[in-house]
Amino acid sequence: MNQTVYLYTDGACKGNPGAGGWGVLMRYGSHEKELFGGEAQTTNNRMELTAVIEGLKSLKRRCTVIICTDSQYVKNGMENWIHGWKRNGWKTAAKQPVKNDDLWKELDALVGRHQVSWTWVKGHAGHAENERADDLANRGAAQFS
């Protein structure tokens, strides 16, 4: 039986670049798990990507995964842009190197292990799970600020 896991992810950055954190609320049925971490010198986009990566890395077996993020950057990157980047040797349409390609490549490999769908949620709009992911990301950032 294929399990459905919800990953609510968020990233935070104090300064951009600066101290940053990532947070994940994982939900499978009635089970929940919280993950968070951070880095001393990073960007908000790197933390958004890292949140999804860490959530996927924590899954022990193949799952149906619904990723709920407030990051259009992450959602658009995985649903639209990544195909062209890979085709163009990790260059943008303007022939520039893709920013954060190390994380995009890792995320792409992890997504390939699961059946993943992407959902965008408006950040800071009272979405309970997104607010929890945001709190976790801020806890991760606080370790370095």
From Swiss-Prot:
Binds 1 Mg(2+) ion per subunit. May bind a second metal ion at a regulatory site, or after substrate binding. GO terms for molecular function: magnesium ion binding; nucleic acid binding; RNA-DNA hybrid ribonuclease activity. Mg(2+) 1 binds at residues 10, 48, 70. Keywords: Cytoplasm, Endonuclease, Hydrolase, Magnesium, Metal-binding, Nuclease. Its EC number is 3.1.26.4. It is found in: Cytoplasm. The keyword Metal-binding applies. GO terms for biological process: DNA replication, removal of RNA primer. GO terms for cellular component: cytoplasm. Residues 1-142 form the RNase H type-1 domain. It catalyses: Endonucleolytic cleavage to 5'-phosphomonoester. Mg(2+) 2 binds at residues 10, 134. Its cofactor is Mg(2+). Pfam families: RNase_H (PF00075). Its main location: cytoplasm. Monomer. Belongs to the RNase H family. Endonuclease that specifically degrades the RNA of RNA-DNA hybrids. This is Ribonuclease HI.
